[in-house]
């Protein structure tokens, strides 16, 4: 059934919809299956995303028609489809009237993903009007709070030197805590890897107790504050809260040095909101493990990594992993820096829409996945600043002289970039950085030809 006479209004102007402030706008790349017209399929997509189905129903009235989602722009050649969703369509909390991301996803990436006339459809951007934006929690903490704990300026405080304890599984509590201590002697921040939790060989309570002690010892030895991101991911709300409360109690006077990691993609919006609302004084570390199943450019359905990042700021993530923008081992390229800008800036331009965040706190980009001291300068050149949390697992623990030296090499690399000094030149007077060249020779040969002669390495 062709529903374009009801669910398509190609005379609507995007600027007018934005000025009206009553619609969430979504841009998709959509292709109909063979034999289906583009506008007809787009209208069916909008109907399934809002008030319609595949037939007319007798219960529809004038009010219902007034909240139809509307296709307002199509470009069949480029496969671009844009839909305007009235804000009234989205579910609200009964406890406080707040918005919920699960409702946003149910409508914009719901039944429409399985429609028989759609070959593929993937959301590439969305715009949130002020009246709806203000209903989301947004972040309560971000990198500025980490800088405060670390004793740095809360504006432009620079890279937080971090790591992921490796191997990701198989370490018992004491070796895990020992690895934390070793890294903290040179670095700032350690995160649980996403599968680490309460395995039988590494009970959470025992591990956390030893990690808290390792933090105290590292702080005493270095005279510097240290940070730890503890995984509280669980299926059950009460389990997440129980883990969080135990961790804070165990860290005691260092509770404000603790972030909570949640696997936000696999657990969904409910888990992020549980952490955001139960622990508003903790940095909420959004890990996105599994997201590539829908966000990868190889996947033609779902939504992009940019969309995931933008949603995370609405939900209240203090920080989210954004990949390595083509400079590490993860899928991505230099253009992914727009994710960092959308997370971090007061207003930013996405692939299709300009978003003003209206004073909502920033979400911090977290950089991880195959990074080491040699790759950082290129990454910072592309991004334009170093105000990120950078977590190198192999880049720290793969250093020939151990994790302490690995952490120092990462910091020295950032210092060299900020000073505008060539990395090979800087390495001549910084041993840990010089040894990073020997630790990662394949990267060194590719990125810094001639380094062996310059550093006297055979």
Curated annotation (Swiss-Prot):
Gene3D superfamilies, per the entry: Ribulose bisphosphate carboxylase, large subunit, C-terminal domain, RuBisCO large subunit, N-terminal domain
Q: Which GO terms describe its molecular function?
A: magnesium ion binding; monooxygenase activity; ribulose-bisphosphate carboxylase activity
GO BP of this protein: reductive pentose-phosphate cycle
What cofactors are annotated for this protein?
Mg(2+)
Q: What class of enzyme is it?
A: lyase
Give binding positions for substrate.
111, 168, 288, 321, 368
User: In this chain, where does the modification N6-carboxylysine occur?
Assistant: 191
Where, by residue number, is the active site?
A: 166 (proton acceptor), 287 (proton acceptor)
Asked if Magnesium is a keyword of the record, the answer is: yes
Q: Which portions of this protein are annotated as coiled-coil regions? A: none
- Report the catalytic activity: 2 (2R)-3-phosphoglycerate + 2 H(+) = D-ribulose 1,5-bisphosphate + CO2 + H2O; D-ribulose 1,5-bisphosphate + O2 = 2-phosphoglycolate + (2R)-3-phosphoglycerate + 2 H(+)
- Which keywords are on file for this protein? Calvin cycle, Carbon dioxide fixation, Lyase, Magnesium, Metal-binding, Monooxygenase, Oxidoreductase, Photosynthesis
Q: How is the cofactor bound, as the UniProt entry phrases it? A: Binds 1 Mg(2+) ion per subunit.
* Sequence similarity: Belongs to the RuBisCO large chain family. Type II subfamily.
Give the miscellaneous note: The basic functional RuBisCO is composed of a large chain homodimer in a 'head-to-tail' conformation. In contrast to form I RuBisCO, the form II RuBisCO are composed solely of large subunits.
Q: What does this protein do?
A: RuBisCO catalyzes two reactions: the carboxylation of D-ribulose 1,5-bisphosphate, the primary event in carbon dioxide fixation, as well as the oxidative fragmentation of the pentose substrate. Both reactions occur simultaneously and in competition at the same active site.
Q: What is this protein called?
A: Ribulose bisphosphate carboxylase
Source organism: Rhodobacter capsulatus
């Amino acid at each position: 059934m062709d529903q374009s006479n009801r669910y398509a209004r190609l005379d609507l102007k995007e600027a007018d919809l934005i000025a009206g402030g009553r619609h969430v706008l979504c841009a998709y790349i959509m292709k109909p299956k063979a034999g289906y017209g583009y506008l007809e399929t787009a209208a069916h997509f909008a109907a399934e995303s809002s008030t319609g189905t595949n037939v007319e129903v007798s219960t529809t009235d004038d009010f219902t028609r007034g909240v139809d989602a509307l296709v307002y722009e199509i470009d069949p050649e480029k496969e671009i489809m844009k839909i305007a969703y009235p804000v009234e369509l989205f579910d609200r909390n009964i406890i406080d009237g707040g918005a919920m991301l699960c409702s946003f996803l149910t409508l914009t990436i719901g039944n429409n993903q399985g429609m028989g006339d759609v070959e593929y459809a993937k959301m590439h951007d969305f715009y949130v009007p002020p009246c709806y934006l203000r209903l989301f929690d947004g972040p309560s903490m971000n990198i500025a709070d980490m800088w405060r704990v670390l004793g740095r300026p809360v504006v432009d405080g620079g890279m937080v030197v971090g790591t992921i304890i490796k191997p990701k599984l198989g370490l018992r509590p004491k070796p895990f805590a020992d690895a934390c201590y070793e890294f903290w002697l040179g670095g700032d921040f350690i995160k649980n890897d996403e599968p680490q939790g309460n395995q039988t060989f590494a009970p959470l309570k025992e591990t956390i107790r030893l990690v808290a002690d390792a933090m105290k010892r590292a702080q005493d030895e270095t005279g510097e504050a240290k940070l730890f991101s503890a995984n509280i991911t669980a299926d059950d709300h009460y389990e997440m809260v129980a883990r969080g409360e135990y961790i804070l109690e165990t860290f005691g006077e260092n509770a404000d040095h603790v972030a909570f990691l949640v696997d936000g993609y696999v657990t969904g919006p409910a888990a992020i909101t549980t952490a955001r609302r139960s622990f508003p004084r903790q940095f909420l570390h959004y890990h996105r493990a599994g997201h590539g199943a829908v966000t990868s450019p190889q996947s033609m359905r779902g939504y992009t990594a940019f969309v995931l990042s933008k949603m995370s700021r609405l939900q209240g993530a203090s920080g989210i992993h954004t990949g390595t923008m083509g400079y590490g081992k993860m899928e991505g390229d230099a253009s992914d820096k727009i994710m960092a800008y959308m997370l971090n800036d007061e207003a930013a331009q996405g692939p299709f829409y300009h978003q003003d965040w209206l004073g909502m706190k920033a979400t911090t980009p977290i950089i991880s996945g195959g990074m080491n001291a040699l790759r950082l300068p290129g990454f910072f050149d592309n991004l334009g600043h170093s105000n990120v949390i950078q977590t190198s697992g192999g880049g720290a623990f793969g250093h020939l002289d151990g994790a302490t030296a690995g952490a120092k090499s990462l910091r020295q690399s950032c210092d060299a970039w900020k000073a505008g000094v060539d990395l090979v030149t800087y390495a001549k007077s910084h041993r840990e950085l010089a040894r990073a060249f020997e630790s990662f020779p394949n990267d060194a040969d590719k990125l810094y030809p001639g380094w062996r002669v310059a550093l006297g390495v055979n």
